[in-house]
Amino acid sequence: MIDLLIIAGPTAVGKTDISIELAEKLNGEIISADSMQIYKYMDIGSAKITKDEMKGIPHHLIDVVEPHEEFNVSSFKALAEKSIKDIWNKGKLPIIVGGTGLYINSLIYNYDFTDADRDEKYREYLTKLAEDKGKEYVHSLLKDIDEESYEKLYPNDLKRVVRALEVYKITGKSISEYTKENEKKLYDIPYNVNYFILNMNREVLYERINKRVDIMMSKGLIEEVKKLESMGYTPDMQSMKGIGYKEVLFYLNGDISLDEAIYLIKKGSRNYAKRQLTWFRKDKRSIWIDKDKYSSEEEIVDKIIKMVKDK
C-alpha cells in the first residue's frame, strides 16, 4: 500500500512553507491539488509557487494545461494517480498539497468518474418528456420503481428525479440501494492516508487573505490579466472565471472601479476560504492542526512527522 501525506487547508493559511519542509525531511515530492495552479500563464492570481520557493523539491500538476483547455476532477485524478505511483516507485513520499477539496476527495475516496452508470440519451429523453408532459409526469414514473425516491423528491427537483430514473434503468436498483452499495466501496483505496488540515483564527486568516490580494495587485495582477486577454483568453473560459481574474476583467471592461474589483476579490477569497473549511470538516479521517497553538512552523512540521510515524 502506498503512503500518502495530504496537507490541505483554506487559501492563505500557509500550506506552501510547511509542505516544502515536510518534503525535505520526509524525502517527498509534492503534487498540487489546486484547481487554478494547473493553468499555464496564470501565476499571480493563483498565488502559484515560484521556483525559488520550491527549494529544489519537485512539484507536479502545476502548469499542465493551457487556459483555454477544459480540466476537471476526472482529469486531475488520472494525472495525480500517475504522479503518486511515479513518486512512490522512486522510493519517495507523495505529498498532496492544496485547497481544492474535490480534487483531494477524488484520491482518498473510490469515486468512479467513468460513464458506466450514465445514459445520456435516456437523460435527454426524460428532460424532453418533462418539457412536453410536465415535471410532475416524469416524477410520477418513480412511483412504481422507486417509491422511496418518489416520496422524498419533489417534481421540481428534476435533476435528481432524472438521476433516480436513470440509475434504475441501468442497474435495476433504487437510488438508495445503489448509493449504499457504492458507499461500501468508497474507502477501498490503494493508499495509507495521513490527512492534515491546517487552520488558524478566522480573523487572522481573513487579514492574511486581504494582505495576499494587496500583494497580488502590487505584483501585477492587472498586467497578467491584460496579457491573458491579449493572448486570446476570454471571460467565458473556465480558467478566467477564477477569483481575481473575473473581477479584474470586470474592471478592464469598465463595469466596476479598481477599488470595487479589489474589494470583490478580497470578499470572494474570504468566502471561498469559508467554503473550503466547511468542505474539509466533512472528512472524519482528517487531523486538524491549529496553527495558532504552535510557536513556529518548524514545530508544526515536527508534530506532523511524529503523528505520521506513530500511526
From Swiss-Prot:
Reactions listed under catalytic activity: adenosine(37) in tRNA + dimethylallyl diphosphate = N(6)-dimethylallyladenosine(37) in tRNA + diphosphate
Keywords: ATP-binding, Magnesium, Nucleotide-binding, Transferase, tRNA processing
Binding site for substrate: 11-16
Any one of the GO BP annotations: tRNA modification
Gene Ontology MF term list: ATP binding; tRNA dimethylallyltransferase activity
Region entry Interaction with substrate tRNA, spans: 34-37
Cofactor: Mg(2+)
UniProt keyword annotation of Lipid metabolism present: no
First-level EC class: transferase
Protein residues bound to ATP: 9-16
Entry's EC annotation: 2.5.1.75
Keyword Electron transport (UniProt): no
Family under the similarity heading: Belongs to the IPP transferase family.
Subunit description: Monomer.
Record's protein name: tRNA dimethylallyltransferase
Native species: Clostridium botulinum (strain Kyoto / Type A2)
